[in-house]
Design a protein with these regions (language model features):
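Carbohydrate-recognition loop of C-type lectin domains
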Residues: 133-252
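N-terminal polar alpha-helical/low-complexity "assembly arms" that mediate subunit docking
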Residues: 1-137, 232-274
Length: 274
């Protein structure tokens, strides 16, 4: 069973576009409509003056109406998997019997204490719908992959294949280092996949690290003349790292054109890739 790519869903109609000027104009127009006809010209002239108390009152009301609509929009997003974030997302995915994974536990012994590194919203958002794959007891590929990804927060990706009948090989990619999964992580995943409610009795399971293909990016970035070179370089490196992180998955390629695009931030005029 394939899961829906929620990133491709159209924006929901329940999210209302907000415009302060439109709200203010609507409120003022309604006041004019409720005014006796012989007084409308005077009210209209009053509302045209920013210093008039009536104008200030309509502005304050329009601003409060804008905040109320924004709160309604936020509440609607909080119950949608594609838009929920933080603890809203944590509560939402609990309905899938899924919880946010710990990538690196907190360390209270350091000064200052080191907070825990948790699974990102985007990764949790992608993993939650895959929980339905885990409902099968027949050992489908997607079920093995879901349970492998959910076994430990350090698992960045997992792929299951069957090289021969009744044999299952699950390759895992680590978030740490260059992606090579160490023995400890492999053992954790193997144990998670070996439960009676996960692995069919006849399946012979092998868990191993994914094969890592190392690569190097060497680029010369040409910027517009000016003193602000360092912020441009930092922005380019951050955007490149964000792209690399999205490609840190089994079977995904890193494309030269995408590297070029990632490095081309505001202030960059040309990129040469070696």
């Amino acid at each position: 069973m394939s899961t829906v790519d929620i990133s491709l869903l159209p924006p929901p109609d329940v999210i209302e576009p907000l415009n302060y000027e439109t709200l203010l104009s609507t409120i003022q127009q309604r006041i004019i409509e409720l005014t006796p006809e012989n007084e409308r010209a005077a009210v209209r002239a009053t509302l045209a003056l920013e210093s008039e108390p009536l104008t200030m009152l309509t502005q304050a009301y329009a601003y409060r109406a804008l905040l109320t609509r924004q709160r309604v929009n936020d509440a609607a997003r909080a119950v949608m998997l594609a838009y929920a974030t933080g603890t809203d997302l944590d509560n939402l995915v609990a309905a899938f019997n899924v919880q946010r994974l710990v990538i690196r536990p907190a360390d209270p012994t350091t000064i200052p204490p080191t907070p825990a590194v948790m699974e990102s919203d985007s990764d949790l958002r992608k993993r939650a719908p895959q929980a339905f794959e885990g409902l099968s007891v027949a050992g489908p590929t997607a079920a093995y992959e879901f349970f492998a990804r959910s076994a430990d927060g350090r698992v960045a990706d997992a792929k299951a294949t069957s090289p021969s009948p009744a044999c299952v090989t699950v390759c895992i990619l680590s978030r740490e280092g260059n992606g090579t999964a160490d023995t400890g992580l492999i053992d954790i995943v193997d144990q998670a996949l070996s439960g009676d409610d996960v692995r069919p009795v006849a399946d012979r399971l092998t868990v191993q690290t994914a094969e890592i293909v190392n690569y190097e990016i060497v680029a010369t970035v040409y910027c517009k003349p000016g003193p602000e070179i360092e912020p441009i370089a930092q922005a380019a490196l951050q955007q490149l790292q964000d792209y690399i992180n999205t490609r840190h998955r089994i079977g995904l390629s890193v494309w030269r054109s995408s590297i070029d695009a990632a490095l081309t931030v505001e202030g960059v005029v040309h990129v040469d890739l070696d």
